[in-house]
Amino acid sequence: NMNRRNISPQAVRICGLTLLCLAIMFGVAAANKAKGGEKLVSEYTVQDDVLPRHVKFESMPADMPQMTAAWFYKYKGLGQFDMCSRLFPQDQLEALNFEQEDRDFKDGYYIQEYIVHGFKTLSQEEYEDQKARYDQLAASYGYKEYKVVRVSFSQKWSPKALQKAPQWGDGEFTRDFAVGREAGLREKWKIFELGMM
């Protein structure tokens, strides 16, 4: 009798496993998306006649605090100032004034190249002189923990910006980022203190 379709137990098992695999895949994808879903690559180039941009990481971040500092260079270097503001606590945005940087960028006054040479997470001894201040700030934001990441980098201004002789010109610099981990299940870090160059 051809009408009775025999579905073997094996077929049911295979079907069940396939669904399980799909569920796991979607779960992993959702978790990655929750993390931000964006992957950092070692080089970004925007070939634009008016506003060319270049960001290169000679060394890649090793963990989330270093990654947070890396996003700062990526977003700033590509002129994505709306993304920069996501890296900082809400109450610091006015002082950081990314809207002004965005306007300057569109007018051609901007840093057109960042080469990030390396990341170093400092030991407590290395930021001893700032520790009391960092502790107080981190506590005021309710962070679970914080790290201090030192970034060494080179920057190159646009020709138009150089005519205005910026305070920190072209060259090689280091900058410290105090990065705090927000309370909650998702591992989210914010830059709560942007060090002097």
Tell me the role of every PLM-derived stretch:
Residues 30-78:
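Short, low-complexity N-terminal intrinsically disordered segments enriched in polar/charged residues
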